[in-house]
């Protein structure tokens, strides 16, 4: 289990979203994609600095560590009626990922859009003992099968530092 202190320290002082504008699939390119669906509600899980606020219609950002969130809460503790679309861009990478996925299943109705880390530690030295969940294409496919999701896309994406991430969209 990841110590809350380590996550809070990491996200409040170490992590920066310097990649956001440069990501091929999961940066600002998502604005047009999501808005074209005219969603009645969008949940941004682990929204960080809430960069999509005001850009994506009907968006609510949750994050347990960042004051820019609309609601300062973790996905594990968040309760709400389901949103049409969920964004999970780097937030489902540590802790009890299986429980987080189970909880997320109740929070979206149409699509969930993910960017995940395949278990590659970040290059910053100050993130304590945070272990990154080892996402793989096979794991993504198993999760889809477990919950009965379709996979609309599954792509490799690279950060500005050259680190691999996976971008995928689940559909119900």
PLM features: residue spans?
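A conserved beta-strand element that flanks and buttresses the S-adenosyl-L-methionine
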Residues: 87
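Conserved beta-strand signature within the Rossmann-like core of class I S-adenosyl-L-methionine
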Residues: 109-121
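Acceptor-substrate binding/catalytic loop of class I
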Residues: 122-139
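Conserved S-adenosyl-L-methionine
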Residues: 149-159
């Amino acid at each position: 289990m990841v110590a809350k202190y380590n996550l809070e320290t990491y996200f409040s002082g170490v992590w920066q979203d310097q990649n956001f504008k440069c990501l091929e699939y999961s940066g600002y390119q998502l604005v047009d994609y999501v808005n074209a669906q005219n969603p009645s509600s969008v949940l941004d899980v682990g929204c960080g600095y809430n960069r999509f606020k005001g850009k994506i219609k009907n968006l609510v950002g949750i994050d347990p560590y960042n004051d820019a969130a609309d609601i300062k809460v973790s996905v594990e503790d968040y309760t709400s009626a389901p949103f049409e679309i969920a964004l999970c861009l780097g937030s489902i990478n540590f802790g009890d990922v299986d429980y987080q996925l189970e909880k997320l299943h109740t929070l979206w109705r149409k699509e969930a859009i993910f960017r995940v880390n395949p278990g590659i530690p970040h290059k910053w030295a100050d993130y304590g003992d945070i272990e990154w969940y080892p996402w793989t294409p096979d794991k993504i496919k198993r999760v889809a099968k477990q919950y009965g999701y379709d996979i609309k896309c599954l792509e490799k994406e690279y950060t500005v530092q050259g680190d691999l991430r996976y971008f995928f969209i689940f559909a119900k």
